[in-house]
A protein has these predicted regions:
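Outer-membrane beta-barrel "beta-signal"
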Residues: 53-55, 166-176
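Outer-membrane beta-barrel channels and translocator barrels
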Residues: 75-79, 105-110, 153-155
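Short glycine/proline- and aromatic-enriched beta-strand/turn motifs that initiate or cap beta-hairpins
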Residues: 25-76, 85-86
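Transmembrane beta-barrel domains of outer membrane proteins
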Residues: 73, 101-105, 149-151, 173-175
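Outer-membrane beta-barrel translocator/channel fold
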Residues: 63, 116-143
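Residues that define the transmembrane beta-barrel architecture of outer-membrane proteins
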Residues: 45, 64-70, 78, 92-98, ...
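Transmembrane beta-strands of outer-membrane beta-barrel proteins
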Residues: 45-51, 80-82, 113-117, 158-160, ...
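Cleavable N-terminal export/targeting peptides
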Residues: 1-42
């Protein structure tokens, strides 16, 4: 009998994210304290685990592969965050994105609607695809990713991430 079979890169991503969950439930802060807003109240949730099963590419390319992402954020005072995401990029290469960000709640006066922007360093677009992202040097490049989300409940949300001129990523987030 075959149980759940994942490609090795996806299995590694899942294992890393699951291994990080117990650590994030502790009171220790993993993000540098200077990233939070001094004097702002502590966030109501410790962190967020995000999963993206689907990415829509603007241009159809036979080289494109399915993109799967697993990310974990630590929430900081002042609606700031830092985190790391593990994903298979558009060409099937294992990739990582370490980032800091800001979340803007109550977008357009709607409590469920929010926007988020993250900025950081990405690694993973290596030969022969190093020219597929701007400012790439040996697989390392800066990245800025804006997104819009909708809170389904106090813990659950869906988000759309705008990946430059390349794609839209659809994801589900669970705060803990």
């Amino acid at each position: 009998m075959k149980l759940l079979q994942l490609p090795p890169t996806r299995a590694i991503f899942c294992a890393l994210a699951l291994a990080a969950l117990p650590a994030l439930s502790q009171e220790t802060r993993y993000c540098p304290s200077f990233l939070g807003v001094k004097g702002a109240p502590e966030p109501t949730h410790r962190g967020e685990l995000t999963f993206s099963p689907y990415t829509y590419h603007w241009s159809q390319n036979p080289q494109h592969k399915q993109v799967v992402l697993l990310a974990i954020d630590e929430q900081l005072p002042g609606n700031r965050l830092c985190g790391v995401s593990f994903f298979s990029n558009s060409f099937g290469q294992p990739s990582i994105y370490a980032y800091v960000g800001q979340q803007f709640n109550n977008l357009m006066g709607r409590p469920q609607l929010f926007a988020k922007v993250t900025a950081g360093i990405m690694y993973g677009y290596v030969a022969p695809y190093e020219n597929k992202v701007p400012l790439n040097y040996h697989g390392i490049n800066p990245a800025v990713i804006p997104s819009v989300g909708y809170k389904l409940s106090p813990h659950d949300s869906v988000q759309v991430k705008f990946l430059g001129t390349a794609a839209l990523m659809f994801s589900y987030g669970r705060q803990f």
